[in-house]
Regions:
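Mobile "lid/hinge" segments at catalytic clefts and subdomain interfaces of large enzymes
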Residues: 152-237
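Glycine-rich, flexible beta-strand/loop modules in the N-terminal catalytic cores of phosphate-handling
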Residues: 23, 35-120, 125-127, 132, ...
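Short, Gly/Pro- and small/polar-rich lid/capping loops
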Residues: 1-33, 38-39
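Small-residue-enriched alpha-helical segments and adjacent helix-cap loops
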Residues: 82, 86-88, 98, 102, ...
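Catalytic cores of large soluble enzymes that bind and process phosphate-bearing ligands
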Residues: 7, 15-16, 23, 61, ...
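Feature captures eukaryotic membrane-trafficking machinery centered on endolysosomal pathways
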Residues: 136-145
Length: 237
């Protein structure tokens, strides 16, 4: 684990670990300082800015938790410029909407059931490495951003993609490995338990799936430990 600071930004912190063969870096204190918290997370060459903002007072007249998770894709993240006359981005794509739900699902139950303040988690994709999932990167960043904020949260969580090629398990498989993949399972978990599983598979035996989930949970622990380290050093009360 590597932790560094910056002279020009007194609140700047940089945390780095190796996650499934690729560097996972989380930086705070440099961007979006007016939010409750902000984390710039990079996994390989994939970079996502995640911000967490909460209202100061509970929202009137609601009997639910008003949480919004926005996963914003930009064409410049893959080196393209919109070709339309207006040069504007369109509405969120279906994969972006599904990515927002992927992050929302494991996090929502970990907030207090009586919380009525507006909470917005915005994930802005800045660059994409096709070997490193921006959805998983955003999920880790969202967990870190909420954990170090002053919003009550019973986390952290971390995410991983579990694959299987018929012989061995693949954790956060690369684009080349996904070509022979017989199973793609996205798993989110806390230190103690699995909180979300989303899977598509081609006739994978139950025992293979179960053992893969157990191993994936173990592979998540370094990321959770890193977020705990961030909370202990820069977390808001």
């Amino acid at each position: 684990m590597i932790i560094t600071t910056h002279k020009q930004f007194p609140n700047y912190k940089r945390y780095e670990i190796e996650y499934e063969g690729r560097p996972l870096v989380m930086e705070t204190g440099k961007l979006a300082e007016l939010c409750n918290s902000a984390v710039l997370v990079s996994y390989g060459e994939t970079t996502v800015l995640v911000t967490c903002t909460a209202s100061a007072r509970p929202k009137d007249g609601v009997d639910y938790f008003p949480l919004s998770v926005d996963f914003n894709e930009k064409l410049y993240a893959v080196g393209r410029i919109p070709g339309s006359f207006m040069r504007r981005e369109g509405k969120p794509s279906l994969p972006a909407v599904l990515a927002s739900r992927l992050i929302d699902r494991p996090m929502r139950p970990l907030f207090p059931s009586d919380l009525r303040n507006d909470v917005i988690i915005a994930c802005e994709v800045l660059s994409v490495d096709r070997d490193c999932s921006p959805e998983i990167t955003a999920m880790i960043g969202a967990s870190a951003a909420v954990s170090i904020s002053d919003v009550p949260f019973n986390g952290p969580i971390a995410g991983i993609v579990l694959g299987w090629d018929g012989e061995k398990y693949l954790f956060n498989p690369t684009q080349e490995q996904r070509k022979t993949n017989r199973m793609t399972t996205t798993i989110a978990a806390t230190h103690k338990k699995i909180v979300m599983i989303e899977s598509e598979a081609d006739q994978v035996p139950d025992d293979v799936m179960y053992e893969g989930i157990v191993q994936a949970h173990a592979h998540l622990q370094p990321v959770l430990d890193l977020i705990d380290k961030m909370v202990s050093e820069i977390g808001k009360p």
